[in-house]
Structures are given as structure tokens and as C-alpha cells.
């Protein structure tokens, strides 16, 4: 199993090119199943989750291949509508094939998902919506077995999600695109990745209004065609590398990104004392002193994203003063706290609240990554610590950060990937 060996006390500075967003690429890949003609997707990151979903789609007999950052897909040869546990167990986004399969082919058998262990994140909202569209849903032996109503077409309906759900919104708008009639969805997620998916569906011939709002109206069409589309830049990767500048009196320029995707995070960075400058496709963060304490409350978009909570907490560990974090999205999303404390942080957790008392510096220690975003907070913390830190279970970081060692080295981090079996 791979580990990172990081020799700390680095100043994080330099330029880094941001990849396509994993959280956008995965639903876009699933949406390719809806198209009757070939689809080409650009700016697709080379990540384990992406490779897993491509393998899953290919296992259905679909011709799908990746060259560089481009994926092409032709669904003409599909011969089954099955998503096996062996693949789905590693990645929650696999459930996103359910809507496209059900809408286009009238049936699907998809294993219940896996992925990061940061709360239950149930798929019940997906299933309730499909049932409202006339589907028959049963769960047997860990698999969701879905069947469209008589005639093979889902039926448009009016449905409001009980809670804001990104995956649920994505799954249902894909299904509604080919449903018979009009679907009105309420309490939709507003995340940029949802907007990106809706825009691609429109490019494929879907009729969707209200994109980027809490209520979307989807008028079902008979068929969707392929298109050529590019994945939106990864706002979380952007924020993660900019965070390194705030921790180390650094200066980081992120390219191929958009400040419009990261407004709530950039505002908090400025509150912490960073100098933020932006252009059409770049963001620069400069830090000249010690970070200031800040209060963070995670919220659905356009609020502060839960996927940046761990990275900003790592900054707050070095801040002058006491910061308070309230996690409103997922339970169990403070699993990085004991590991940051091992590196010398002073954090106490009570339920959904974490209180962070700033310390002068981190100290090197062996730590263990617990989930995708937590792993990046540990990498950045270790990069600032005096001495050598060993980070275990880094397969988590490989799920969400493309070419992470190369990008970190370009920013001055002394990092080496080693195999613990060596």
C-alpha cells in the first residue's frame, strides 16, 4: 500500500494547473449512457474514481475509452444494464448510472454504493423520485433493481427533494430528460457540478429550464444525441492548493480555474489575511503573515463547501486565535481531527462543532488519511511541519487529486510516494 513521505518546513509557492472537476466528470460520464450517438468529453481528470466508472460503463458492453484528458463513448453496443458490487463498492458516484439506464432502457440493476466513510449519505431520495416517475424499485441482496412502468418510459412528475442532495438532483434530471412528459423538481442542489451536468444535457438535446436554481423543469424528449463537452475546473482542487499558501506565508497561482466557482472559500481566505487576485481563468493567493482565526459553517452551495472544511481547518490550526467550525452537511466529517492533533494541532470536537485553537507550528508525525479531503489537509499540514511525516492510506487522495505529487513538488513540497511493502 502506497504512503507519502513528506519532509516539511516548506514554503508553498509557484504555479499549478487545475484539472477537470472529479465531481463534475463522474455525472457527465454517466450521462453519456443517455446518448444514441457518440459523445466526446474533454478535461477529464486521470483519477481512480474516473477509471472505475469507465470500467463500470465498459462492462455494460459500451465502447468507452480515455486518451489523455479526453473520453469518447459510443453506446450502440450496450448488452446489459448491470453495475456490480465489486466496482460500485469503491465509489458512491456509481449510483449515477441508475437514472440513465432506467430512463433510456427501462431497467437497471445497480449495487448500493460505497466510497468515503463520512456518513450514511443515503440514496433514498434518488429512489423516491424514480418511484414518483412510475418506476418499480426493489432492493435485494444489496442491489437496487429498477423497472420502468409499462411501455418502458418513466413518466414526468412533480417532485421535491426532502433535503438538498447533489447526487439525487443529478440522477433525477438525467432520468427526467428522457421521461414522457414534464418533470418539475423542487429543492434541487445548486452546486456548479449540477449546473455543468444540466448544461451538457442541453447540449445533448434535453429541454431544461431553471438551471442553477432550486426549481428545475425538464421537458422529456424522445432521444438524446451525443455532443462534445468540457468538464468544469475543479474548485476543490483549486482551493486545496491555494490553502497551502495561507499555511506557509506562500504565494500560489492556480491556472485553468474560475474564481466564480469558489467565491465563499476565497472570501474566507481574505478574512484569514490572504491577498487574493483573480483573472478570467486564474486565482492567486499570497500570504505575508500568520493566518487570522475564522468561523466556518458548511452549507450547500452557494454556502461554504463541506469539501473544503478539512483544508481550511488545517490553516486555522496555525491561526492567531480560536476558530470555530460547524459541519452541517455530513456526520463523521471530523475524522481528520485526531490526525491533525497528532501533528501538534489543538482541536476539540463536540458533535457537529470543532473548536480550533491556533498553535505556532505543526510537528512531524506518522498519520493516516481517513477520507479524500482529509488526506489533503494532512499533506498540507505535514508540508509545514519540521521533520519527516509519513501519511498512510493515500489511496484516498488518489481518488480526487490528479498528479498530486507532481503538482505539490512544483509548489516546493518535498514529497515522495513509497510502497510500504518495499
Curated annotation (Swiss-Prot):
Catalytic-site annotation from UniProt: 116 (proton donor)
Principal location: cytoplasm
Key words of the record: Cell cycle, Cell division, Cell shape, Cell wall biogenesis/degradation, Cytoplasm, Peptidoglycan synthesis, Pyruvate, Transferase
GO biological process annotation, one example: peptidoglycan biosynthetic process
Name listed for the protein in its UniProt record: UDP-N-acetylglucosamine 1-carboxyvinyltransferase
Role according to the record: Cell wall formation. Adds enolpyruvyl to UDP-N-acetylglucosamine.
Reactions mediated catalytically: phosphoenolpyruvate + UDP-N-acetyl-alpha-D-glucosamine = UDP-N-acetyl-3-O-(1-carboxyvinyl)-alpha-D-glucosamine + phosphate
Family, as annotated: Belongs to the EPSP synthase family. MurA subfamily.
Compartments where located: Cytoplasm
SUPFAM superfamilies: EPT/RTPC-like (SSF55205)
GO cellular component: cytoplasm
UniProt: UDP-N-acetyl-alpha-D-glucosamine binding residues: 92, 121-125, 307, 329
Gene Ontology terms, MF aspect: UDP-N-acetylglucosamine 1-carboxyvinyltransferase activity
Amino acid at each position: 500500500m502506497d504512503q507519502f513521505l513528506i519532509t516539511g518546513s516548506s514554503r508553498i509557492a509557484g504555479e499549478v494547473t487545475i484539472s477537470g472537476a472529479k465531481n463534475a466528470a463522474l455525472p457527465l460520464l454517466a450521462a453519456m449512457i443517455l446518448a444514441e450517438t457518440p459523445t466526446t468529453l474533454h478535461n477529464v481528470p486521470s483519477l481512480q474514481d474516473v477509471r472505475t466508472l469507465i470500467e463500470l460503463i465498459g462492462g455494460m458492453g459500451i465502447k468507452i475509452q480515455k486518451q489523455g484528458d479526453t473520453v469518447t463513448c459510443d453506446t450502440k453496443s450496450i448488452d446489459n444494464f448491470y453495475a456490480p458490487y465489486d466496482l460500485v463498492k469503491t465509489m458512491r458516484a456509481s449510483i449515477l448510472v441508475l437514472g440513465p439506464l432506467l430512463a433510456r432502457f427501462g431497467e437497471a440493476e445497480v449495487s448500493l454504493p460505497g466510497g468515503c466513510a463520512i456518513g450514511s449519505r443515503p440514496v433514498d431520495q434518488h429512489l423516491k423520485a424514480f418511484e414518483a416517475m412510475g418506476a418499480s424499485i426493489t432492493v435485494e441482496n444489496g442491489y437496487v433493481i429498477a423497472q420502468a412502468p409499462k411501455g418502458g418510459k418513466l413518466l414526468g412528475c412533480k417532485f421535491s427533494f426532502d433535503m438538498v442532495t447533489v447526487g439525487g438532483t443529478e440522477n433525477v434530471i438525467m432520468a427526467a430528460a428522457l421521461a414522457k412528459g414534464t418533470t418539475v423538481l423542487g429543492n434541487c442542489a445548486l452546486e456548479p457540478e449540477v449546473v455543468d451536468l444540466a448544461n451538457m444535457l442541453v447540449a445533448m438535446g434535453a429541454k431544461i429550464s431553471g438551471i442553477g436554481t432550486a426549481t428545475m423543469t425538464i421537458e422529456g424528449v424522445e432521444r438524446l444525441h451525443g455532443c462534445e463537452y468540457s468538464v468544469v475546473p475543479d474548485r476543490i482542487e483549486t482551493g486545496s492548493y491555494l490553502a497551502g499558501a495561507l499555511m506557509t506565508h506562500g504565494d500560489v497561482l492556480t491556472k485553468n480555474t474560475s474564481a466564480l466557482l469558489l467565491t465563499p472559500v476565497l472570501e474566507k481566505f481574505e478574512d484569514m489575511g490572504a491577498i487574493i487576485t483573480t483573472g478570467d481563468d486564474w486565482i492567486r493567493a499570497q500570504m505575508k503573515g500568520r493566518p487570522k482565526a475564522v468561523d466556518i459553517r458548511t452549507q450547500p452551495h452557494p454556502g461554504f463547501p463541506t469539501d473544503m472544511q478539512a483544508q481550511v481547518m488545517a490553516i486555522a490550526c496555525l491561526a492567531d486565535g480560536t476558530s470555530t467550525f460547524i459541519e452541517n452537511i455530513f456526520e463523521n466529517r471530523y475524522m481528520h481531527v485526531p490526525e491533525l492533533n497528532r501533528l501538534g494541532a489543538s482541536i476539540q470536537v463536540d458533535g457537529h462543532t470543532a473548536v480550533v485553537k491556533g498553535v505556532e507550528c505543526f510537528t512531524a508525525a506518522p498519520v493516516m488519511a481517513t477520507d479524500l479531503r482529509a488526506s489533503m489537509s494532512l499533506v498540507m499540514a505535514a508540508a509545514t511541519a519540521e521533520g519527516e511525516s509519513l501519511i498512510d492510506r493515500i489511496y484516498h487522495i488518489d481518488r480526487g487529486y490528479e498528479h498530486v505529487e507532481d503538482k505539490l513538488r512544483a509548489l516546493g513540497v518535498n514529497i515522495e510516494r513509497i510502497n510500504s511493502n518495499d
